[in-house]
């Protein structure tokens, strides 16, 4: 479902930097906006209201399907875990449990059903492994993201070939973390 929504509705593949820049602020707002965090979460949820359709295999999808919305959230959570693992020496089991509990509080701010949310860090690990093993599909959107290039902004005064060479390691690192 997530791949179909990205393919049909997102500008991520056309304007990756702009899409990320527009998303980071509100997503971080759900974590750091204090008393306004639940309002920010509701705003993000509203952004997804009209993201629906039928995928290439004839299956209906909607971004507000609780399983789909939680999976997207779970990928942000695992990005934090993997970034700490790859670049900061990892987290202790106690820190992973704490971060899991915090990610549940973060997710609650969206006002979505809590049904798909695992009850513990251990259940989350089982959930993550199961979804990665049994549910993920190599959709056209996922394939496009694998080969995405970050276009050079007009104001950058360097040749395009140099820009592309500069960002190849960055895009490669992004894929490595996501894997």
Language model region names:
Residues 1-179:
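Mature, function-bearing regions of proteins
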């Amino acid at each position: 479902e997530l791949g179909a929504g990205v393919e049909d509705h997102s500008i991520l593949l056309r304007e990756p930097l702009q899409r990320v820049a527009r998303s980071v602020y509100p997503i971080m707002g759900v974590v750091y906006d204090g008393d306004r965090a639940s309002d920010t979460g509701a705003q993000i949820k509203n952004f997804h209201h009209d993201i629906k359709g039928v995928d290439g295999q004839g299956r209906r999808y909607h971004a507000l399907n609780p399983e789909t919305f939680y999976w997207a959230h779970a990928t942000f959570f695992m990005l934090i875990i993997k970034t700490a693992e790859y670049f900061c020496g990892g987290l202790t089991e106690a820190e992973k449990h704490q971060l899991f509990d915090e990610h549940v509080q973060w997710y609650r701010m969206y006002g979505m059903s809590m049904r798909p949310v695992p009850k513990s860090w251990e259940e989350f690990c089982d959930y993550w492994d199961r979804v990665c093993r049994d549910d993920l599909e190599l959709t056209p959107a996922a394939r496009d993201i694998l080969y995405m290039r970050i276009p050079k902004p007009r104001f950058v005064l360097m040749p395009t070939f140099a820009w592309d060479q500069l960002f190849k390691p960055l895009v490669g690192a992004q894929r490595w973390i996501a894997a």
